[in-house]
Structures are given as C-alpha cells and as structure tokens.
Amino acid sequence: MPEPWGTVYFLGIAQVFSFLFSWWNLEGVMNQADAPRPLNWTIRKLCHAAFLPSVRLLKAQKSWIERAFYKRECVHIIPSTKDPHRCCCGRLIGQHVGLTPSISVLQNEKNESRLSRNDIQSEKWSISKHTQLSPTDAFGTIEFQGGGHSNKAMYVRVSFDTKPDLLLHLMTKEWQLELPKLLISVHGGLQNFELQPKLKQVFGKGLIKAAMTTGAWIFTGGVNTGVIRHVGDALKDHASKSRGKICTIGIAPWGIVENQEDLIGRDVVRPYQTMSNPMSKLTVLNSMHSHFILADNGTTGKYGAEVKLRRQLEKHISLQKINTRCLPFFSLDSRLFYSFWGSCQLDSVGIGQGVPVVALIVEGGPNVISIVLEYLRDTPPVPVVVCDGSGRASDILAFGHKYSEEGGLINESLRDQLLVTIQKTFTYTRTQAQHLFIILMECMKKKELITVFRMGSEGHQDIDLAILTALLKGANASAPDQLSLALAWNRVDIARSQIFIYGQQWPVGSLEQAMLDALVLDRVDFVKLLIENGVSMHRFLTISRLEELYNTRHGPSNTLYHLVRDVKKGNLPPDYRISLIDIGLVIEYLMGGAYRCNYTRKRFRTLYHNLFGPKRPKALKLLGMEDDIPLRRGRKTTKKREEEVDIDLDDPEINHFPFPFHELMVWAVLMKRQKMALFFWQHGEEAMAKALVACKLCKAMAHEASENDMVDDISQELNHNSRDFGQLAVELLDQSYKQDEQLAMKLLTYELKNWSNATCLQLAVAAKHRDFIAHTCSQMLLTDMWMGRLRMRKNSGLKVILGILLPPSILSLEFKNKDDMPYMSQAQEIHLQEKEAEEPEKPTKEKEEEDMELTAMLGRNNGESSRKKDEEEVQSKHRLIPLGRKIYEFYNAPIVKFWFYTLAYIGYLMLFNYIVLVKMERWPSTQEWIVISYIFTLGIEKMREILMSEPGKLLQKVKVWLQEYWNVTDLIAILLFSVGMILRLQDQPFRSDGRVIYCVNIIYWYIRLLDIFGVNKYLGPYVMMIGKMMIDMMYFVIIMLVVLMSFGVARQAILFPNEEPSWKLAKNIFYMPYWMIYGEVFADQIDPPCGQNETREDGKIIQLPPCKTGAWIVPAIMACYLLVANILLVNLLIAVFNNTFFEVKSISNQVWKFQRYQLIMTFHERPVLPPPLIIFSHMTMIFQHLCCRWRKHESDPDERDYGLKLFITDDELKKVHDFEEQCIEEYFREKDDRFNSSNDERIRVTSERVENMSMRLEEVNEREHSMKASLQTVDIRLAQLEDLIGRMATALERLTGLERAESNKIRSRTSSDCTDAAYIVRQSSFNSQEGNTFKLQESIDPAGEETMSPTSPTLMPRMRSHSFYSVNMKDKGGIEKLESIFKERSLSLHRATSSHSVAKEPKAPAAPANTLAIVPDSRRPSSCIDIYVSAMDELHCDIDPLDNSVNILGLGEPSFSTPVPSTAPSSSAYATLAPTDRPPSRSIDFEDITSMDTRSFSSDYTHLPECQNPWDSEPPMYHTIERSKSSRYLATTPFLLEEAPIVKSHSFMFSPSRSYYANFGVPVKTAEYTSITDCIDTRCVNAPQAIADRAAFPGGLGDKVEDLTCCHPEREAELSHPSSDSEENEAKGRRATIAISSQEGDNSERTLSNNITVPKIERANSYSAEEPSAPYAHTRKSFSISDKLDRQRNTASLRNPFQRSKSSKPEGRGDSLSMRRLSRTSAFQSFESKHN
C-alpha cells in the first residue's frame, strides 16, 4: 500500500520544530518548575495525536503481512547425484548464503543427535527437515516492462503450506477484491503449444465473457508458458477493448520464476522484465494477470510447490457464501429501520451454497488427468470443462467421455484404441498407459460432472455457456439456488435453458424472492423471464417490498437522497429510512403544478399509519396531512371525512397496488434505471401516461441536478432519458392516431385516476412536451375544443364578432350535436345531460308516430325514397338545437370568449388612453370609473383563478398560479394601478403622481396585447422569439455594463477632477457613454479647446480654460470604447439574436401550437362575461355554489371538474386500455421491422452468415480429409483382406495335395505388409540414393528347381515401393557429432514382376559371410507397413561408413573379423566376420546371400530339436531384420533423443543398435497417422539391447546417461502425477517406479539412474490391424496373426511349401545361412503372451 507522503512531510516539519524548540528549552528559557509545557512538546503531541494513527495503521498492515506469511529457504546442503555442484533443492551450493557442506553437517550433527557423515550424505533432501521458515520479504506491486502500457499486478511470496484463510483475507482486505461469484481454475499443458486460430478465438472470447458477466476469479499457473500464455493473450485482447480489468490470479512456484531477485522487497513497486532467457529453465510471469501468489517450498527450478496451496485455496473459497445482494434488514413485524446511506446493519442474502468452482482443461499432460480425478473426487465434487480439439490430455478425456458408458465402462476394442492413443500421445509404455487408463476410467465414473466443449457443436456455441452449464449440473442444488446462481452471474440464457424447464418444481415464494433480487440487482432480462414463468406482479408488489426497493444500495448512483433532503428542507439523520410518503412528496415536487401523488393522499396515509404508525410516530408529522383538504371545507367536514376512512387491515388486497407496473416504473425512473423503466413501461395499462410522467420526472431531476452543481454527466444522462420517454409518447400517439382517430382523442382526454386525475394532455403540458402537443391528433382535439359546439370552417373570427355585436345572428350559425363530440369534457357532458333531461319527450314521440304512419301509406315503389327522406329528417332532427341551448353554447365556446374578452380589452385600452391623454379632474370621470371597475373585476378574477386551482394548500395554489409569466405581470400592473388610483384621489401634488403612475401603467397593458397575438399562427412565434431575445439581451447588458462603466468612470474622473459628492455623478458616468452606443458621440466634447488664448479672424481674443491634466487620454480611451461597444458588442448581440431567431424558427410551429394550448385552456375555464361584466358571472357562481351546498350537504366538490376531461364508463375505459395495448404491440412490431431492415442490422446479419458459412466450409473440408483418410484405410484393409485370401488359397492347395513346385510358386508370390528378410531378398534389387542399382539374383536350386515365378495377378495390388530411411553420422567427437546429426540415404526395394527381370550376374567368390543374422523376437509383429530395421552386429565393425567399396549386404573387407554379440535373450554365441575378397561389382546374387557362411549362431539356432523342424510348420510371413549393412549410414550417437526423424508412410526405419545402448527408443513422429498408418502396430519393432550389454561396446553411454536424459521442468511437471502430500509421496512414487522398472524387463519401461524413465522404442502414431484406425473410426474385427500361427504350429502333418530339398544343398555350404534361417517360426511369438 502506498505511504502517505503528506503525513510524512508534516511529521518531518514537526521534528524540525521540535529540534528548534528543544534547543530553546535547553537554554533555560522555560526552566521553572511550575512553568507550562514547552511549545515543542505541544507540537509533538499534536502531531502524534493527529497523524500517528494512520502511520501506525500502515505499519500494522505491513507487519500483518510479514507476520502472516513466510518464505522457505534451504538451510541444509545435500549435493545432488546428478550435479555435485548443486544442492538437491535446485540451487548451486554457492548460492546458499552462509552455508557450506561442512557447516551444514556440523549443524545437523547438533540438531540430529550427531549423525555420522555417511548417514548425512545418504540422507534424502526433505522440505520439512532441510528448509527454514522466515517472514516473507517479497510483496508489493509489479510493473511489467516491455510493452506499450506497463501493466501492474500485486504479488506476495508465501510458503507452500500457508493457510488459505490468510490468503483470502489478503485478497479481500488488503488487495480490496470483492468475493467472486464464480471461480474458474484453468489447467493444461505447461509446455508451449499452438491452438487452432478459431479455437483460440472462441476460447479467449468465451473465457472473458464468463468472467465478465459473472464477476469471476480466474486461477492459473501464472507463468508465461503453455495454456497460461493463451489465457494471457485473451486477457490482452480484452484489455485493449475494455477498461475493466478481470481478476486473474496466478499461483506460481517461487522457484520457477525468473528474475526472482527483482521481486524481493517489502511493500515495494518493482519493474519486471517479461523477456525470458532461452538458456534458462526458469520462466517469466505473465504480464496480463492482476495478482500473483508465489508459493515457496525452498526449491528452485521445480514445479509442484503451488499444487497443494492452489487446491486448498480453491477449497476454502468454495466454502464462502455468495451474497447475491446486500439489503437493509427489514422485518414487517418488528419494523426495524436501519441505515441506508450511512453505516448500517445489512442482511446478506445468500444462496445457501458457496462460491462455485469449475476446472477448465485445455491440452495438458498426464498429470492433468490426475488433477481432473482429484477434482471429481473432492467433496463436493468440482465440475470439469474439457476443451476438445486442444490436444493431448483434453482430447483423451473428450474421447473417453464420448465413448464410455455409465460407471466408467468402455468397449474392449475402444479400450485398445485408447491405450494405443495414450502410448503415442505421451510416449508411454504399455504399463504406464494402462495405469493412466485406469485413472481415466475412474474419471469416467463421474462423467456427468465432465462437460466437453466442442467447437461448432450444436450444444455449446460458446465456452462460457459450457462452463456455466457444467456448474449448474455439478452444483446439485435446488432450483431456487440454481436460479440465484444464474442471477448472480447475470446469465439469463442459462436460466432459460437449464433452470426453467418443463417439470421443475418451485417452492412457494421462491420466484417472488428471485424477482426481488432481480429488481435490486437491475437484471431486466431476469425480470422478464420471471414474468413469463408465472410471477404475478400484483401479488408480488407490496408496500414493504416497494419501500425496500427504494432503500436499496445496488444499482446506479441516483439523486433520490438529495431530493428527499430538499423536500424535507433539512439534513436527514444518518439512520433515516426513506418511506413511500417521502417518495410521494418527491414526486409532487418534481411533477410540479397541481399534481397529487397517491402516496400522499388520505387513504394511503391512513393505511400506512395503521400498518406502521405505532413504530414511526414522526412519520406523519413531517408531511402536513391537512394540505389536501380544500380551503373552502370546514373543520367539521375534515374530521368527518377522516372518520369515514375505514380500512380493513385483514384484507389481503389492501397491502397491494392496483397498478403495480406504474409503481415499479416510477421506482425505476427515480432510481435512474433506464432499461428497467423502459421494460415496465411496456407492461400494464396507460402506457402513454406513463411515458409522459417519466419524461417529466427525468426532466425535473436533470434540472435539480444542474441546480445542485452536480456532475454534468448526471444532468445530461437524465435529459437523454427524458427525451427517450418523450419520443415513446409521441410515437405511441402517432400509432394510435393511425389506427383510430376517435379512440386516440379519447386517450388524450380521459381522466387518469392513478395519475392525479389528470389527462395525457395535461401531463404533456406539465412536461413541456411540445412535439406531443404539436401532433395532429392533439391539434385536432384543441381545434374542436376551441370551437366548442360551433360548426365553422371559414371566417370563424368574423362570424363570432358578428354574433357578439349582433346577437340575432347566432341563430344562423351551425352547431354540433352530441354524437359529433364523443370526446367532450366532463363539464359539458354533465350540462348536456341536465339540459336533455329537462326537455319534453312527447313531441319527439309524436313525430316518430307520424313518420311511421306516413311510411305505411306509401307504396313499395317509393319505399326507398321515403327511407332516404327519413334518414335526412333524422339527421336534421339531431341538428335542431333549442334557442336557449344555442345561446348558451355560443357564449361558452372558447373562441367566443376570446373575442369577447379581446373586444372588451380593446375598449378598456381606449378608455385608458383617454384618461391619461386628457386633463385629469378632481374626481374621476365616467370613463375613468369604467377603467377602475375593469381593473378591479380583473383582480377578482385572478383571485378566483387562485382559489379554484387544483392544489389543496393556499400557499401551493399561489405558487402554482405564479408560475405563469403573465400572471406575475398582471399582479404587478394591478398593484401599480391601485397605487396610482389612491394617489389620484388625493389632492395635489399626489394627484399628479397618480397620473404619472397611470401613464407608466398603460405601457404594460399595451404589452399585454402580445399575449392575445399568441393565438395567431404567424404572430405567435414572433412573440416567442421576443421573449427569448429578451433573455439573451439580459446577459449582453451585463457585459455591456462592464465596458460602459470602465470608460465612463475614467472619462468623468479625468475631465472633472474637482466635483463635489452628488448623485449626479452616477448619471454623468452613464449618460454620455450610453448614448455613444447608439451613435451620439458628442464631437464637441471629445477634445474641447483649452490652454492658450486663441485669436479670431476679426481680431478678438478667446479666453480658453486651462487644460486638465491628462485630458489627451480621454479621446484615446473613447476610441477604444467605441470600437468595443459599437462594433464588437453590438454585432455580438446581433449574432446572438440571429441564432435565437433561427432556433425558434425551426420550432416555430411547435412553439405556436404549444402556446395555443395554453390560450385555449385559459379561455375554456374563464367565465362567459369579460371584465367589468365578469362580476355578474362571479355572483352567479357563488349563488350556484351555495345552492349546491344547501341541496347536498355531503357532496364532494371534487366530483365536478371543469377541466378538459372525458367522462367514460368502466367498460369504455377497458376498451380504451385494450386499444392502447394493441397500439403498443403494433408499435414494437413495426419498430422491430424497421430495425431489421436497417443497413447496420443487415450488414451484421450478413457478416454472421458469412462467418457461419466459412465455418461450415471448414467442417466440410475436414470431413473431406477424413473421408480421404478413411478411403486410404479401406484400401489398406482391402489389401490385408487380399493377403488373407491368399493365405486361405495356400492352405487349400496344401490340403488338396498340390505339387510341391506349384505350391512354392504360389507361396513365393504372397507378401506381407511387415516385410520379412525373405521378402527383402525377393525384391531382386536395391536402389540407392546415389542412383546405383543393386540387383539380387534368385537362387536356383541345384536339383533343378524352377525359379520363382512372377507374381499372381490376384496379388498385383500388393506390389508397393518400399524405401529405407537410414541415418548416417561420422564417428566424430565433440561438437562435430552434434552438428552432423544424420544424413539420410534412401534405398528402395522393387519387386520384380517376372523372373526375366532378375539379372543373372556372375557369382562372387565364396567367402564366409556374416550378413543377415535373424534372431527370434518374442514380440509378435503385425501386418504393418512401416517397420524398424536395426543393425546391431555392425556396430563393432571398423569399416568406414563412407567406404563405397563395401557391399551393402555386408561383404566387408578381408582384413577384419569382429565378434558380434547376438541379440537373442538366451544367446551366448557370436557371429564372426571372416575376410573375403571384395567383389568386383556392386551387384550381388541371391546365391551369394544364401551361401554365406555363418560360423557361430545362438543356441536357439544350433540346438533345435529334431522333432520340431522349423520348416515343418508353416513359415511365418513377418520378420524383423536385425542386421544390415545399411546401418553404416546411421548415426552412432544418441542424438535421437532431442529430435526424432519423421517417418513417411510405407517406409522402413533403419535404427542403429547403438541408439539402444542406454535403452533409449527412437520417438518417431509420423505425419498422416490418422490415414495411412492407422493400422500400424507398435509391436513390429526390435527389442532393445539389455543394459548389461552396453558396457561391452566402445563409446557406450554408461557414464553420461544423466546428461542426456535431462529434460525441461515443464516436461517433468507434465509427466509427473501431482500429489497433495509432501516428500513422503515423492519417495513412495520413486520406489514404485524402481519396482515397476525391475519387473517389466525388455517389454516395459527402462529405468536409468536418477529415476529417469526412457520408454522403449515403439512405432509411434500407429495402430494394429485389429484396432480401428483412429479414436473416431469404426471398429473392425479380424483374427490375430499370432492366433493363426498358433493353430498352424499344431498342424504337424502339413508340409511346408517353402521347404527346400535337403539333397539339393551343395557341399561345403553347411555353414551357410539359408532361407530356413530367414523364416524361423520361433521368432514370431504372440505379443500378448509376454504380457499375460
């Protein structure tokens, strides 16, 4: 943690003062006994008291880390057997500071009872015994270098056995990490590997998405190798796109980290280089991690220290409970109110289970499979996600998961495939593969906990979906807990697909609790999902829950607390809890005007008081309950109505809301949750009203945020939300108007009981939503309201004026009937009903009877005309309105009232002009009394408007009335006129003052005409422009005042320095500079003449005043002033006016229409008569009110509303709501269509389709390749089938007693995939890489036997071209051996198509040949194409490998003879090479091969029992060649350990026997192993040489084996099986390895010194013919070759067709190696027999 440098700086200053004052104190200044404390002591104490606690806190934190965490260091040097210069801990002996071997011995002699030196040296190094704990010395912050942006990460070095609770405390408290909702533990290969680009992209994207959406932690190994490198790449891509950092914790061993010394330091910031040293075995940390925990067990360069620590930490984190939300504790019974904004007691609502953990497997070695088993066996088990296609362990796990059955069982054939796959993948022996297979099958016993992610599969498109699905499957939790997990992860897709499934049982109330959590956490998709699955919001939402939602801490920051504080007009206590009544006051404050929230009405307050009142005595005192009672009500009525409110608390519906979506939308708006508010707006009734209310609330909150000097972003965001809701309201109105105009108008005028009994038009005006008012539907309604019941289209103004001036003309006007006004106001409806009730019904009935009689008298012909006439009469009847009704409707129309008031106002102004222009008499004239009466009655009308307004309290009524601009100006004008009238009635001089006030007052009444102009379509916008320009000019005047003052004061002070104090000075300052703005520059006063006297032309002398000091400055500053004022500021004002003009011009239509509404509503509510006749209307209204109170004492005055409200019944209201919901559905459907048809969406869909098509094409290509490979495999198997058919034909020929010669011909044509020595001889020629051809001549039996016949046509497909790949290396030493690793030479064997193609060459001189020694092999070879051919005997020959004179088949120089040990297990004889003459040609005959002398053979060859002639049984078809002259081209050093040659299919691999000296096999990589070599068996290889024999060979590897077998730590870590135990398990594993290696012998893994295991040589990437070609191929069953051979071996009566006649053997060739040696049956024993 960073140190408080300011505190340290202050403490340093305090120390300086302390030193100075201590010196002063020492001088004896304050040495009295009773003197006060010295000043330095006081300062020191103050500093300690103020700042030392923070310093002590920092020190305490540092000391806590040092006390809690330790490091381990090796304190006992035990030299390693591999490297004597290193200790067993991995460090050099010199790196052990303060320790030497002798010192360590002495220390151990003291501590361990004086053990002997031999015992100490034989002692094994142990962590517990030979390491020492000490406080950690490495923790702080890492700054990774080497990139464009230096990433930072926290780190700490801890012991490997640290308690996990300390680590969790470190992460949550010191590192300030939030407890995760998910823990993803990534495991995989430690060695670097490559992923497919598409798979890497999907893996990274899915991992980041899973971590971001769920708030997860990611655990990795921390180092920059293997799978961790791929995780770092994904984090790097995410960091470049998003600022949020994912919590990625790397748990790495301290001993494997490179540049450890750079990290040592306590609470430091260390730079760290990410470039790794290629020569070092250590690795660097990954720079994209956020935190590192470095586990230390005292070792260096070894993995394993982090395994136990990581697993224990994961286990401890999984025990922590997930807090899905943190809510204030709330009990409905006790009603305990805790703090919300301050420190409060919180009830952590968990899900009952701990943090879920999931293991993610990508690639990996054998140890990963053991880790998976450990996860699955844990309690509770940890689910595992395997990424198929990443390679190695992941693919093996995926294959086992796919083909294994329940209980971990697998098919026998698939078992063999899996074993072979394990062998080839990890280069394992059969025993090791079986051991790993057992572990794999143990994992498959819990395969339901394993989820396999396959890229492109239909089940899992993304890896994050696989991770979360695996967690839900493995959690074994109830449905509510699973839903809480999905809610915490914010993954609604998981909840929809995995939790809300058919047949799921839900406890009572569980979904409601989930709904509450979703609302608190602002999970809109979950709220929608829960509503779709049956959650009733009407039952869910109660008063307590809604209040709980208002007091939640979660969600975005909002201004609700500040609004409540403003409403309360004071600071709130720290433990204050917001109530719904407070929310009601806030809503009323934001809505403004006369809006009344339901939360503040009497019924709700009484209910709230009855429910929670006893525990909250101050709740109602803060509200002012009496403000909702109209002022005109008496006290008795108030008490009576309070007594009438009777609430049944037992009613279950009393605690619920009738419109829950309304309340939730308002909650979302006030809490600034826009997405949630939009969702609730779509549901429920009255969508248009909700949109307008939300628009007004957001706009008011934005205004409050800007007034409170909050961040501008808050105000801008709220304004944006307001515009969104306003746009929704307009679009919904447009949609409803398109469908039905009449119903759309009803939507605008019907009364909204849930929204303060207002209408949508009133809400739109309150929100100042000009676009809504300017809509065509609203304007049509306003036009009808403006006309009232008058039916006029043209010249309406003239007709109305004519009706006012000539009342009889009213009879000629047309009026509308009731059917033409379905959306009339409530007052008009009531009045119309009352008038219709008073009219007699008899004349109408009589008229109908007369019409019926007239119709009956008419004939059929004129029936239609009578019907038309009847319809016209009915229509005319409806248009007939009584005279009284016409007069009433005429004068009550707003347009008539407007012109009536306008004419009266014009008359008032004319009279006012008269009284101010003529001489004022002592007493007012008649004209003046009329003006006075007009102003007086106008004041009474203003008082009526205030009293008749909707707000309850008088003060609130006044505030609402004063919000209108013209009302304020009217009040000022009336008061000013009243003052003038009072002064006018007085004597002089007050009468003159009154007259002046009259003259000033008339100015306003002329300006008042602008309000009348607002009704005009053309003049209205200009009035709006004038108002805005006046506001702009006010800002300009302030700027102008500054410039004017600066010049005016300077000018006045210079020109008039001797002025006396007077108010004239203020006038003189502004007088001239102000008029200069308008062009009056006062030229004669700019530079008046002064100084010396001037003489005119006529000789007169003019005396000039003396010049003022500095008078020349005035013209200069005046020039600057005029430049700024006249040019700059005036033009600036013109530009501002121009901008305002264009701004208003663009919205002039909306502005005029909005002002028109105000005017229409004003005249709609005014009385009929204008002032001064309005007094009669007032008297009539008072009389009606008194009569109403006398008739109905209990009537509610609020029942009759004179506003623009439509009275409709409940059925009609339901129809209106249904119509509105249909409009919403249609609106969203059209919106979706527009979105889908937009260019951006089309481009996005097209890109997705192209990407999907590319993926499909890739899959098609992969399938095509696999089909090709399968076809090749089929070809190979067909060839094998042909081979079997050939064998069957041979057996049939033998049974039918065919002749020997014909049988031999047929047998000579049969071939095998695993080419034997006889087959090599039959190929007739060798083609070397240099282009030389070596032909082989067929042996001709002396007895006259026929030569080998051409191959049968049935066997022609078996002819192939086989090639030898040999490796050559000169016998060089040192670096030359490593440089010339191998030299490839290719020898091809071509089968002769006929005997005529075999060249008859002269025979070479007979000589003892030691060429092809055939040794029996205990392993059964299979029908393979690729084999290994080793030449072991040739290793001791001193022939130069580059000598071209040496025969390929082994005819060496005549001067050497070297014993060669046999490779047979029981062989003790040696084959000796005899000198012979060099053949003249490089060709050799077949006779030479068959006649070569073999002086000594093994006992198996020389002592064969007579009863079992090897030629009596059927000759085997498969052989391994153990000697070949081609081995001279092979390397003689074990370089093959580093890189194995790649063997092509259909090839032989010559491998030197010296490569087996140290029992090392040649790991062969094969391309196309899934196609050509799928049928290859790994058992068709030669057995390696015994360990005991390697010492007899020169250049053996007996001394430097450990140097060659050292491998990288990542390789060791992958091959080792992780264990949670310490060194005891390591010792057990070491002893078990030695025991296994001693039992396996030649067929098992060879164990060398230092416990380094080397697998025996096997054909890698191969399968036997009995096994399927690949894990995904179909199985094919065939008989084993060894089974056939076993059956044939028991058939003693059968004659071998290949057996030659003994008499045909020439003399002198008894020692020769014949073909019988090449086809020895005992060399082909079953492979399984050795393992069984």
From Swiss-Prot:
**Cellular location(s):** Cell membrane
Tissue expression per record: Expressed primarily in the kidney and, at lower levels, in brain, testis, ovary, pancreas and spinal cord. Expression in the brain and kidney was determined at protein level. In the kidney, expressed predominantly in the collecting tubular epithelium in the medulla, medullary rays, and periglomerular regions; in the brain, highest levels are found in the cerebellum, choroid plexus, the locus coeruleus, the posterior thalamus and the substantia nigra. Down-regulated in renal tumors compared to normal kidney. Expressed in the lens.
The Gene Ontology biological process terms listed for this entry are: calcium ion transmembrane transport; metal ion transport; monoatomic cation transmembrane transport; monoatomic cation transport; protein homotetramerization; zinc ion transmembrane transport
Q: Which reaction does it catalyse?
A: Ca(2+)(in) = Ca(2+)(out); Mn(2+)(in) = Mn(2+)(out); Zn(2+)(in) = Zn(2+)(out); Mg(2+)(in) = Mg(2+)(out)
**Regulation of this protein's activity per its record:** Activated by the neurosteroid pregnelonone sulfate (PregS); PregS activates the channel by shifting its current-voltage activation curve toward more negative membrane potentials and also potentiates temperature-induced activation. Activated by sphingosine. Activated by heat. Intracellular Ca(2+) inhibits TRPM3 probably via interaction with Ca(2+)/calmodulin. Intracellular Mg(2+) inhibits TRPM3 activity. Both intracellular and extracellular protons block TRPM3 through propable binding sites in the pore region.
Topological domains, Cytoplasmic: 1-894, 949-964, 1014-1028, 1138-1732
Q: What does this protein do?
A: Constitutively active, non-selective divalent cation-conducting channel that is permeable to Ca(2+), Mn(2+), and Mg(2+), with a high permeability for Ca(2+). However, can be enhanced by increasing temperature and by ligands, including the endogenous neurosteroid pregnenolone sulfate and sphingosine-1 and suppressed by intracellular Mg(2+). Implicated in a variety of cellular processes, including insulin/peptide secretion, vascular constriction and dilation, noxious heat sensing, inflammatory and spontaneous pain sensitivity.
- Tell me what topology the record assigns in the membrane: Multi-pass membrane protein
- GO cellular component annotations of the record: plasma membrane
Bilayer-spanning residue ranges: 895-918, 926-948, 965-985, 990-1013, 1029-1056, 1112-1137
> Which is one GO molecular function term here?
calmodulin binding
Q: Which residues form a coiled coil?
A: 1241-1301
Where do the record's region annotations for Calmodulin-binding lie?
192-215, 300-323, 601-624, 793-816
State the Pfam families in the record: Ion_trans, LSDAT_euk, TRPM2, TRPM_tetra
Q: What is this protein called?
A: Transient receptor potential cation channel subfamily M member 3
Query: Which residues are noted in the entry as 1,2-dioctanoyl-sn-glycero-3-phospho-(1D-myo-inositol-4,5-bisphosphate)-binding?
Result: S796, K1017, Y1018
**Record region (Disordered):** 1459-1478, 1611-1732
Q: Where is the composition biased (Low complexity)?
A: 1459-1476
Q: Which residue stretches does the UniProt record annotate as biased composition, category Polar residues?
A: 1635-1653, 1690-1701, 1720-1732
Query: Which family does the record assign?
Result: Belongs to the transient receptor (TC 1.A.4) family. LTrpC subfamily. TRPM3 sub-subfamily.
Outline which residue ranges sit on the Extracellular face. Answer: 919-925, 986-989, 1057-1111
Effect annotated for changing S1380T = In NEDFSS; uncertain significance
The residues the entry assigns to the signal sequence are none
Annotated consequence of substituting P1115Q: In NEDFSS; gain-of-function variant resulting in increased calcium ion transmembrane transport; basal channel activity is increased and the channel is more sensitive to stimulation by heat or the neurosteroid pregnenolone sulfate; the mutant channel can be inhibited by the TRPM3 antagonist and anti-epileptic drug primidone
Known InterPro entries for this protein? Ion_trans_dom, TRPM, TRPM_SLOG, TRPM_tetra, TRPM_tetra_sf
